[in-house]
Amino acid sequence: MGAAGNTGSSGDSRELMSAADVGRTISRIAHQIIEKTALDGPDGPRVVLLGIPTRGVTLADRLARNIGEYSGVEVGHGALDITLYRDDLMQKPPRPLEATSIPAGGIDDALVILVDDVLYSGRSVRSALDALRDVGRPRVVQLAVLVDRGHRELPLRADYVGKNVPTSRSESVHVLLAEHDGADGVVISR
């Protein structure tokens, strides 16, 4: 299935990242996490990756696999549902609740890395921070995203960014992952 077929756009779309690009980018982010957190060192922190549904969960799973493969350290990973913490509940159609899954050991005193596919206004991340507060008390919270498209409405930034993509507000960025869309890729559409 072609990447542009899943955008829901009027056909004006172009590929930003191929499947190979997505794979390399996830691998690079995994290496950056290992290096920045000293995860594979003798006093490395306990790291937990929490994906923001839907594609953030899949990215967190892939990052956890890569980190384990590259460092020999297994990291906990799960999902953090932000639905009830969103500030746009009344403006959008109802959404089903997703499952929140926290790995054994919880998140207290851990280095938690929130994982999302696209960083845009920052509102999803703010919702995730609110949800996280109800789950536990991490020592440090960081953010990893596959694509940062700018246009922040809140003073947030990602610690790990796969690709910075300057966009206009009229454009949409769609991350496609094989587990959901049949193939990996990133497309931009008007």
From Swiss-Prot:
A motif (PRPP-binding) lies at residues 112-124. It catalyses: UMP + diphosphate = 5-phospho-alpha-D-ribose 1-diphosphate + uracil. One of its GO terms (biological process) is regulation of DNA-templated transcription. Coiled coil: none annotated. Its EC number is 2.4.2.9. This is Bifunctional protein PyrR. Belongs to the purine/pyrimidine phosphoribosyltransferase family. PyrR subfamily. Regulates the transcription of the pyrimidine nucleotide (pyr) operon in response to exogenous pyrimidines. Keywords: Glycosyltransferase, Transcription, Transcription regulation, Transferase. NCBIfam families: PRK05205.1-3, PRK05205.1-5. It is an enzyme of class 2 (transferase). Pfam families: Pribosyltran (PF00156). One of its GO terms (molecular function) is uracil phosphoribosyltransferase activity. It comes from the Bacteria. Disulfide bonds: none annotated.
